[in-house]
Amino acid sequence: MQVFGSSGTRGRVTEELTPDFVLRVAAAAGTVWGADRVALGRDTRLTGPMLANAAASGLASVGADVDRLGIVPTPALQAYADREGVPGVMVTASHNPPAYNGIKLVGADGVELSVERLEAVESALLDDDPAHAAWDRTGTDRTVESARRTYREELLEAVDREAIAAADLTVAIDPGHGAGALTSPEFFRELGCDVRTVNAHPDGHFPGRDPEPVAANLQDLGTLVRATDADVGIAHDGDADRAIFFDEAGSYIEGDATLAALADAVLEAGDTTVSAVNVSQRLVDVADANDAALELTPIGSTRIMTRIRELERAGKRVPVAGEGNGGVIFPDYRINRDGAYTAARFLELIVDRPASEVLEPYDGYANVRRNVEYADEAERATLVETAGEWAHSADGEVTTIDGYRVDFGDAWVLARPSGTEPVVRVYAEAHERDRATDLADRLVETLERAAAGE
Protein backbone atom coordinates (compact mmCIF):
# COMPACT_ATOMS: atom_id res chain seq x y z
CA MET A 1 0.00 0.00 0.00
CA GLN A 2 1.43 3.37 -1.05
CA VAL A 3 0.06 6.21 1.06
CA PHE A 4 2.06 9.19 -0.19
CA GLY A 5 2.05 10.27 -3.81
CA SER A 6 3.94 12.99 -5.66
CA SER A 7 2.70 15.74 -3.32
CA GLY A 8 1.56 14.17 -0.06
CA THR A 9 -1.61 12.15 0.26
CA ARG A 10 -5.01 13.21 -1.08
CA GLY A 11 -8.45 11.81 -1.69
CA ARG A 12 -12.17 12.44 -1.73
CA VAL A 13 -13.19 13.27 1.81
CA THR A 14 -15.22 10.63 3.71
CA GLU A 15 -14.61 8.18 0.85
CA GLU A 16 -10.84 7.88 0.45
CA LEU A 17 -9.72 10.42 3.05
CA THR A 18 -11.51 10.00 6.37
CA PRO A 19 -10.95 11.75 9.71
CA ASP A 20 -9.78 8.43 11.14
CA PHE A 21 -7.17 8.08 8.40
CA VAL A 22 -5.92 11.63 8.95
CA LEU A 23 -5.69 11.00 12.70
CA ARG A 24 -3.63 7.87 12.09
CA VAL A 25 -1.32 9.60 9.59
CA ALA A 26 -0.73 12.45 12.04
CA ALA A 27 -0.04 10.02 14.88
CA ALA A 28 2.38 8.08 12.67
CA ALA A 29 4.17 11.29 11.67
CA GLY A 30 4.32 12.40 15.29
CA THR A 31 5.76 9.03 16.26
CA VAL A 32 8.50 9.30 13.63
CA TRP A 33 9.28 12.92 14.48
CA GLY A 34 9.24 12.49 18.26
CA ALA A 35 8.76 16.26 18.46
CA ASP A 36 7.40 18.19 21.43
CA ARG A 37 5.60 20.66 19.12
CA VAL A 38 4.11 20.45 15.64
CA ALA A 39 2.67 23.23 13.48
CA LEU A 40 -0.73 22.64 11.87
CA GLY A 41 -2.26 24.64 9.03
CA ARG A 42 -5.02 24.26 6.47
CA ASP A 43 -6.39 25.81 3.31
CA THR A 44 -9.96 27.05 2.82
CA ARG A 45 -11.68 23.75 2.03
CA LEU A 46 -14.94 23.06 3.85
CA THR A 47 -13.54 19.85 5.29
CA GLY A 48 -10.42 21.60 6.58
CA PRO A 49 -11.62 22.20 10.15
CA MET A 50 -12.80 18.61 10.53
CA LEU A 51 -9.56 17.13 9.23
CA ALA A 52 -7.37 19.62 11.09
CA ASN A 53 -9.12 18.56 14.30
CA ALA A 54 -8.40 14.94 13.43
CA ALA A 55 -4.74 15.73 12.75
CA ALA A 56 -4.47 17.67 16.01
CA SER A 57 -5.92 14.71 17.90
CA GLY A 58 -3.46 12.31 16.31
CA LEU A 59 -0.52 14.54 17.15
CA ALA A 60 -1.69 15.15 20.72
CA SER A 61 -2.16 11.42 21.23
CA VAL A 62 1.58 10.88 20.78
CA GLY A 63 2.49 13.75 23.10
CA ALA A 64 2.96 16.65 20.67
CA ASP A 65 1.69 20.14 21.44
CA VAL A 66 -0.04 21.61 18.40
CA ASP A 67 0.48 25.16 17.12
CA ARG A 68 -2.69 25.86 15.15
CA LEU A 69 -1.97 28.42 12.43
CA GLY A 70 -5.47 28.37 10.95
CA ILE A 71 -5.89 29.12 7.23
CA VAL A 72 -2.45 29.76 5.75
CA PRO A 73 -0.69 29.14 2.44
CA THR A 74 1.50 26.05 2.55
CA PRO A 75 4.65 28.21 2.25
CA ALA A 76 3.51 30.18 5.31
CA LEU A 77 3.35 26.96 7.33
CA GLN A 78 6.75 25.98 5.96
CA ALA A 79 8.20 29.36 6.94
CA TYR A 80 6.78 28.97 10.45
CA ALA A 81 8.20 25.44 10.75
CA ASP A 82 11.64 26.67 9.69
CA ARG A 83 11.55 29.71 11.98
CA GLU A 84 10.34 27.76 15.03
CA GLY A 85 12.32 24.59 14.34
CA VAL A 86 9.23 22.37 14.47
CA PRO A 87 7.76 19.94 11.93
CA GLY A 88 4.40 20.68 10.36
CA VAL A 89 1.21 19.17 9.00
CA MET A 90 -0.64 21.01 6.24
CA VAL A 91 -4.23 19.98 5.50
CA THR A 92 -4.69 20.80 1.82
CA ALA A 93 -5.50 19.24 -1.51
CA SER A 94 -3.75 22.04 -3.41
CA HIS A 95 -5.30 22.22 -6.90
CA ASN A 96 -7.76 19.33 -6.54
CA PRO A 97 -11.55 19.83 -6.73
CA PRO A 98 -13.51 20.93 -3.63
CA ALA A 99 -14.53 17.40 -2.60
CA TYR A 100 -10.86 16.49 -2.09
CA ASN A 101 -8.53 17.17 0.78
CA GLY A 102 -5.13 15.89 1.79
CA ILE A 103 -2.03 16.15 3.94
CA LYS A 104 1.46 17.48 3.33
CA LEU A 105 4.17 16.74 5.88
CA VAL A 106 6.92 19.27 6.50
CA GLY A 107 10.18 18.83 8.39
CA ALA A 108 11.55 21.11 11.09
CA ASP A 109 13.65 22.80 8.39
CA GLY A 110 10.50 23.94 6.60
CA VAL A 111 11.01 21.53 3.69
CA GLU A 112 8.55 18.85 2.60
CA LEU A 113 9.68 15.47 3.89
CA SER A 114 12.05 13.55 1.67
CA VAL A 115 10.96 10.31 0.06
CA GLU A 116 12.97 8.41 2.68
CA ARG A 117 11.26 10.20 5.58
CA LEU A 118 7.83 9.74 4.01
CA GLU A 119 8.52 6.03 3.75
CA ALA A 120 9.32 5.99 7.48
CA VAL A 121 5.98 7.65 8.24
CA GLU A 122 4.23 5.23 5.91
CA SER A 123 5.83 2.26 7.68
CA ALA A 124 4.75 3.62 11.06
CA LEU A 125 1.23 4.06 9.73
CA LEU A 126 1.06 0.52 8.38
CA ASP A 127 2.54 -0.90 11.59
CA ASP A 128 -0.39 0.76 13.39
CA ASP A 129 1.53 1.05 16.65
CA PRO A 130 1.84 4.78 17.40
CA ALA A 131 3.86 5.90 20.41
CA HIS A 132 0.82 6.97 22.41
CA ALA A 133 1.61 9.18 25.38
CA ALA A 134 0.34 8.58 28.89
CA TRP A 135 -2.95 10.32 29.61
CA ASP A 136 -1.22 13.15 31.49
CA ARG A 137 1.45 13.60 28.80
CA THR A 138 -0.82 14.11 25.80
CA GLY A 139 -0.34 17.29 23.81
CA THR A 140 -2.19 20.58 24.07
CA ASP A 141 -3.39 23.11 21.51
CA ARG A 142 -2.54 26.75 21.10
CA THR A 143 -3.73 29.20 18.45
CA VAL A 144 -1.10 31.19 16.56
CA GLU A 145 -2.62 34.38 15.15
CA SER A 146 0.56 35.87 13.68
CA ALA A 147 1.59 33.27 11.09
CA ARG A 148 0.16 35.05 8.05
CA ARG A 149 1.49 38.46 9.07
CA THR A 150 4.98 37.16 9.85
CA TYR A 151 5.02 35.29 6.54
CA ARG A 152 4.26 38.50 4.62
CA GLU A 153 6.93 40.37 6.54
CA GLU A 154 9.53 37.76 5.65
CA LEU A 155 8.48 37.91 2.00
CA LEU A 156 8.90 41.68 1.96
CA GLU A 157 12.46 41.33 3.24
CA ALA A 158 13.32 38.70 0.62
CA VAL A 159 12.46 40.56 -2.61
CA ASP A 160 13.53 43.81 -4.30
CA ARG A 161 10.84 45.92 -2.70
CA GLU A 162 12.26 49.25 -3.85
CA ALA A 163 12.47 48.30 -7.52
CA ILE A 164 8.95 46.89 -7.54
CA ALA A 165 7.49 49.93 -5.77
CA ALA A 166 9.29 52.32 -8.13
CA ALA A 167 7.78 50.57 -11.15
CA ASP A 168 4.25 51.60 -10.07
CA LEU A 169 2.77 48.31 -11.25
CA THR A 170 -0.91 47.45 -11.43
CA VAL A 171 -1.34 43.81 -10.44
CA ALA A 172 -4.48 41.70 -10.96
CA ILE A 173 -4.70 38.77 -8.55
CA ASP A 174 -6.92 35.67 -8.59
CA PRO A 175 -6.29 33.62 -5.42
CA GLY A 176 -9.09 31.26 -6.45
CA HIS A 177 -10.86 31.48 -3.07
CA GLY A 178 -7.89 29.67 -1.51
CA ALA A 179 -5.46 30.41 1.29
CA GLY A 180 -3.65 33.00 -0.82
CA ALA A 181 -6.73 35.22 -0.58
CA LEU A 182 -5.65 36.03 2.98
CA THR A 183 -2.05 36.92 2.12
CA SER A 184 -1.26 37.75 -1.50
CA PRO A 185 -3.44 40.86 -2.09
CA GLU A 186 -2.08 42.50 1.06
CA PHE A 187 1.49 41.45 0.27
CA PHE A 188 1.43 43.07 -3.15
CA ARG A 189 -0.15 46.22 -1.73
CA GLU A 190 2.72 46.33 0.76
CA LEU A 191 5.09 46.07 -2.20
CA GLY A 192 3.61 49.29 -3.54
CA CYS A 193 1.46 47.77 -6.27
CA ASP A 194 -2.04 48.87 -7.25
CA VAL A 195 -3.89 45.61 -6.59
CA ARG A 196 -7.12 44.48 -8.27
CA THR A 197 -8.69 41.16 -7.35
CA VAL A 198 -11.17 38.51 -8.46
CA ASN A 199 -12.19 35.35 -6.56
CA ALA A 200 -10.40 36.85 -3.57
CA HIS A 201 -12.68 35.85 -0.70
CA PRO A 202 -11.89 32.56 1.09
CA ASP A 203 -14.56 30.00 0.21
CA GLY A 204 -14.20 26.23 0.30
CA HIS A 205 -16.93 25.84 -2.31
CA PHE A 206 -14.59 27.58 -4.79
CA PRO A 207 -17.60 29.26 -6.45
CA GLY A 208 -15.67 31.41 -8.93
CA ARG A 209 -13.40 28.74 -10.35
CA ASP A 210 -11.82 25.37 -9.68
CA PRO A 211 -8.62 25.54 -7.59
CA GLU A 212 -6.31 24.43 -10.39
CA PRO A 213 -4.78 27.51 -12.07
CA VAL A 214 -4.99 26.43 -15.70
CA ALA A 215 -6.09 28.55 -18.64
CA ALA A 216 -9.60 27.10 -18.78
CA ASN A 217 -10.25 28.17 -15.17
CA LEU A 218 -8.73 31.65 -15.37
CA GLN A 219 -10.85 33.53 -17.89
CA ASP A 220 -11.98 35.99 -15.21
CA LEU A 221 -8.38 36.94 -14.51
CA GLY A 222 -7.66 37.65 -18.16
CA THR A 223 -10.76 39.83 -18.29
CA LEU A 224 -9.69 41.68 -15.13
CA VAL A 225 -6.22 42.38 -16.54
CA ARG A 226 -7.73 43.90 -19.67
CA ALA A 227 -10.44 45.83 -17.82
CA THR A 228 -8.01 47.42 -15.35
CA ASP A 229 -5.08 47.88 -17.75
CA ALA A 230 -2.98 45.80 -15.35
CA ASP A 231 0.68 45.08 -15.99
CA VAL A 232 0.33 41.44 -14.98
CA GLY A 233 -2.17 38.89 -13.72
CA ILE A 234 -1.30 36.41 -10.96
CA ALA A 235 -3.25 33.25 -10.09
CA HIS A 236 -2.73 30.76 -7.27
CA ASP A 237 -3.86 27.24 -6.52
CA GLY A 238 -5.72 26.32 -3.32
CA ASP A 239 -2.73 26.49 -0.98
CA ALA A 240 -0.88 29.27 -2.86
CA ASP A 241 2.40 27.47 -3.39
CA ARG A 242 2.11 28.05 -7.14
CA ALA A 243 1.79 31.13 -9.35
CA ILE A 244 0.55 31.36 -12.92
CA PHE A 245 0.65 34.60 -14.90
CA PHE A 246 -1.12 36.68 -17.55
CA ASP A 247 0.69 39.35 -19.54
CA GLU A 248 -0.38 42.99 -19.88
CA ALA A 249 -2.71 42.11 -22.77
CA GLY A 250 -4.59 39.62 -20.61
CA SER A 251 -3.05 36.62 -22.37
CA TYR A 252 -2.32 33.43 -20.44
CA ILE A 253 1.38 32.64 -19.97
CA GLU A 254 2.38 28.99 -19.97
CA GLY A 255 3.98 28.01 -16.67
CA ASP A 256 6.86 26.45 -18.57
CA ALA A 257 7.61 29.83 -20.16
CA THR A 258 7.59 31.55 -16.76
CA LEU A 259 9.96 28.94 -15.33
CA ALA A 260 12.28 29.42 -18.30
CA ALA A 261 12.29 33.21 -17.88
CA LEU A 262 12.96 33.02 -14.14
CA ALA A 263 15.72 30.46 -14.69
CA ASP A 264 17.31 32.49 -17.49
CA ALA A 265 17.57 35.45 -15.13
CA VAL A 266 19.65 33.62 -12.50
CA LEU A 267 21.43 30.61 -14.05
CA GLU A 268 25.17 30.91 -14.57
CA ALA A 269 27.79 28.63 -16.06
CA GLY A 270 28.36 25.62 -13.82
CA ASP A 271 25.01 25.90 -12.06
CA THR A 272 22.47 23.10 -11.90
CA THR A 273 18.72 23.34 -12.21
CA VAL A 274 16.25 20.58 -11.40
CA SER A 275 12.91 19.77 -12.98
CA ALA A 276 10.62 16.81 -13.52
CA VAL A 277 10.44 14.36 -16.37
CA ASN A 278 7.71 16.45 -18.04
CA VAL A 279 10.15 19.35 -18.38
CA SER A 280 9.60 21.69 -21.29
CA GLN A 281 12.18 22.06 -24.02
CA ARG A 282 12.24 25.73 -22.98
CA LEU A 283 14.15 24.92 -19.79
CA VAL A 284 16.40 22.51 -21.66
CA ASP A 285 17.30 25.32 -24.05
CA VAL A 286 17.81 27.86 -21.24
CA ALA A 287 20.12 25.51 -19.34
CA ASP A 288 22.15 24.87 -22.49
CA ALA A 289 22.38 28.59 -23.30
CA ASN A 290 23.72 29.33 -19.81
CA ASP A 291 26.11 26.35 -19.75
CA ALA A 292 24.17 24.96 -16.78
CA ALA A 293 23.23 21.36 -16.03
CA LEU A 294 19.63 20.15 -15.96
CA GLU A 295 18.72 17.19 -13.77
CA LEU A 296 15.39 15.38 -14.09
CA THR A 297 13.37 13.65 -11.38
CA PRO A 298 10.05 11.87 -11.19
CA ILE A 299 7.15 14.33 -11.12
CA GLY A 300 6.34 15.93 -7.77
CA SER A 301 7.73 18.67 -5.60
CA THR A 302 8.97 16.15 -3.02
CA ARG A 303 11.23 14.48 -5.57
CA ILE A 304 12.60 17.80 -6.81
CA MET A 305 13.28 19.13 -3.31
CA THR A 306 14.98 15.90 -2.30
CA ARG A 307 17.28 16.15 -5.31
CA ILE A 308 18.06 19.82 -4.61
CA ARG A 309 19.22 18.94 -1.11
CA GLU A 310 21.36 16.10 -2.45
CA LEU A 311 22.98 18.41 -4.99
CA GLU A 312 23.63 21.13 -2.43
CA ARG A 313 25.25 18.61 -0.10
CA ALA A 314 27.50 17.68 -3.02
CA GLY A 315 28.55 21.32 -3.38
CA LYS A 316 26.42 22.18 -6.41
CA ARG A 317 24.75 25.58 -6.77
CA VAL A 318 21.03 25.30 -7.56
CA PRO A 319 19.62 28.84 -7.86
CA VAL A 320 16.26 27.80 -9.29
CA ALA A 321 14.24 24.65 -9.89
CA GLY A 322 10.64 23.62 -10.39
CA GLU A 323 7.92 22.47 -12.72
CA GLY A 324 5.86 24.09 -15.44
CA ASN A 325 2.70 24.09 -13.31
CA GLY A 326 3.70 27.32 -11.56
CA GLY A 327 5.58 25.57 -8.76
CA VAL A 328 8.98 27.28 -8.76
CA ILE A 329 11.67 26.84 -6.10
CA PHE A 330 14.41 29.35 -5.28
CA PRO A 331 16.65 27.39 -2.88
CA ASP A 332 18.61 30.47 -1.79
CA TYR A 333 15.32 31.70 -0.29
CA ARG A 334 13.80 28.41 0.81
CA ILE A 335 13.64 24.90 -0.59
CA ASN A 336 9.92 25.06 -1.11
CA ARG A 337 7.40 26.33 -3.62
CA ASP A 338 5.95 29.73 -2.82
CA GLY A 339 3.40 31.35 -5.11
CA ALA A 340 3.72 34.84 -3.64
CA TYR A 341 7.52 34.80 -3.69
CA THR A 342 7.55 33.44 -7.25
CA ALA A 343 5.17 36.21 -8.30
CA ALA A 344 7.34 38.88 -6.70
CA ARG A 345 10.40 37.51 -8.49
CA PHE A 346 8.44 37.72 -11.74
CA LEU A 347 7.54 41.34 -10.97
CA GLU A 348 11.27 42.04 -10.66
CA LEU A 349 11.58 40.94 -14.31
CA ILE A 350 8.89 43.35 -15.54
CA VAL A 351 9.83 46.54 -13.68
CA ASP A 352 11.34 48.04 -16.85
CA ARG A 353 9.65 46.16 -19.70
CA PRO A 354 6.26 44.54 -20.29
CA ALA A 355 5.61 40.91 -19.45
CA SER A 356 5.02 40.01 -23.10
CA GLU A 357 8.52 41.26 -23.97
CA VAL A 358 10.07 39.31 -21.08
CA LEU A 359 8.39 36.12 -22.28
CA GLU A 360 9.00 36.60 -26.01
CA PRO A 361 12.23 34.54 -26.12
CA TYR A 362 10.29 31.55 -24.79
CA ASP A 363 7.51 31.60 -27.40
CA GLY A 364 7.37 29.03 -30.14
CA TYR A 365 6.55 26.05 -27.94
CA ALA A 366 3.09 24.50 -27.66
CA ASN A 367 2.02 22.36 -24.70
CA VAL A 368 -0.98 20.05 -24.49
CA ARG A 369 -2.17 18.14 -21.44
CA ARG A 370 -4.85 15.45 -21.24
CA ASN A 371 -6.19 13.16 -18.50
CA VAL A 372 -7.40 9.58 -18.92
CA GLU A 373 -9.46 8.42 -15.96
CA TYR A 374 -9.40 4.91 -14.55
CA ALA A 375 -11.90 3.14 -12.29
CA ASP A 376 -9.66 0.78 -10.31
CA GLU A 377 -6.12 -0.53 -9.93
CA ALA A 378 -6.60 -3.14 -12.64
CA GLU A 379 -7.59 -0.48 -15.16
CA ARG A 380 -4.68 1.67 -14.00
CA ALA A 381 -2.27 -1.20 -14.65
CA THR A 382 -3.76 -1.70 -18.11
CA LEU A 383 -3.28 1.97 -18.96
CA VAL A 384 0.33 2.01 -17.75
CA GLU A 385 1.15 -1.19 -19.64
CA THR A 386 -0.46 0.17 -22.79
CA ALA A 387 1.46 3.43 -22.48
CA GLY A 388 4.70 1.47 -22.26
CA GLU A 389 3.87 -0.60 -25.33
CA TRP A 390 2.96 2.53 -27.28
CA ALA A 391 6.16 4.29 -26.22
CA HIS A 392 8.48 1.44 -27.15
CA SER A 393 6.77 1.01 -30.52
CA ALA A 394 7.14 4.70 -31.37
CA ASP A 395 10.06 6.04 -33.37
CA GLY A 396 11.66 8.03 -30.57
CA GLU A 397 13.91 7.98 -27.51
CA VAL A 398 12.14 6.51 -24.46
CA THR A 399 12.73 7.72 -20.88
CA THR A 400 11.24 5.78 -17.96
CA ILE A 401 12.17 7.91 -14.92
CA ASP A 402 8.46 8.39 -14.20
CA GLY A 403 6.00 6.89 -16.64
CA TYR A 404 6.93 6.78 -20.32
CA ARG A 405 8.33 9.79 -22.16
CA VAL A 406 9.11 9.63 -25.88
CA ASP A 407 11.32 12.29 -27.46
CA PHE A 408 10.99 12.66 -31.23
CA GLY A 409 13.49 15.48 -31.74
CA ASP A 410 10.89 18.05 -32.79
CA ALA A 411 8.41 17.04 -30.06
CA TRP A 412 7.85 14.80 -27.05
CA VAL A 413 4.97 13.06 -25.29
CA LEU A 414 4.72 11.63 -21.76
CA ALA A 415 2.19 9.34 -20.07
CA ARG A 416 2.30 8.76 -16.32
CA PRO A 417 -0.22 7.93 -13.58
CA SER A 418 -1.00 10.85 -11.30
CA GLY A 419 0.20 10.60 -7.73
CA THR A 420 -2.87 12.39 -6.40
CA GLU A 421 -5.85 11.55 -8.65
CA PRO A 422 -7.20 8.41 -10.40
CA VAL A 423 -5.98 9.52 -13.83
CA VAL A 424 -3.13 8.86 -16.21
CA ARG A 425 -1.78 12.23 -17.32
CA VAL A 426 -0.65 12.73 -20.89
CA TYR A 427 1.65 15.65 -21.72
CA ALA A 428 2.89 16.66 -25.16
CA GLU A 429 5.05 19.50 -26.46
CA ALA A 430 6.10 20.62 -29.92
CA HIS A 431 6.92 23.83 -31.73
CA GLU A 432 3.55 23.59 -33.51
CA ARG A 433 0.34 23.17 -31.50
CA ASP A 434 -1.14 20.82 -34.11
CA ARG A 435 1.83 18.50 -33.70
CA ALA A 436 1.54 18.47 -29.89
CA THR A 437 -2.23 17.98 -30.06
CA ASP A 438 -1.87 15.12 -32.53
CA LEU A 439 0.66 13.33 -30.33
CA ALA A 440 -1.47 13.70 -27.21
CA ASP A 441 -4.67 12.69 -28.98
CA ARG A 442 -3.09 9.60 -30.53
CA LEU A 443 -1.79 8.38 -27.18
CA VAL A 444 -5.03 9.20 -25.36
CA GLU A 445 -7.06 7.35 -28.00
CA THR A 446 -4.83 4.29 -27.57
CA LEU A 447 -5.23 4.40 -23.78
CA GLU A 448 -8.99 4.86 -23.92
CA ARG A 449 -9.36 1.91 -26.28
CA ALA A 450 -7.32 -0.24 -23.90
CA ALA A 451 -9.44 0.87 -20.94
CA ALA A 452 -12.56 -0.10 -22.88
CA GLY A 453 -11.11 -3.55 -23.57
CA GLU A 454 -10.75 -2.98 -27.30
What spans do the regions from the language model cover?
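An N-terminal, well-structured beta->alpha segment
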Residues: M1-A55, L59-V62, R68, V86-P87, ...
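Short glycine-rich phosphate-binding loop at a beta-alpha junction
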Residues: D36-D43, D67, T170-A172, D271-V277, ...
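N-terminal small/polar loop signature for handling phosphorylated ligands or for N-terminal nucleophile
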Residues: A39-N101, E186-F246
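Glycine-rich phosphate-binding loop of actin/hexokinase-like ATP-binding domains
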Residues: V89, G102-L118, A240-A269, A276, ...
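Gly/Ser/Thr-enriched, mixed-charge loops and adjacent short helices
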Residues: A99-L224
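Acidic, glycine-rich loop-and-beta core segments that form the ion-binding/anion-interacting portion
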Residues: P211-L296
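Phosphate-binding and adjacent anionic-ligand microenvironments
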Residues: D271-Y427, D434, D438-E454
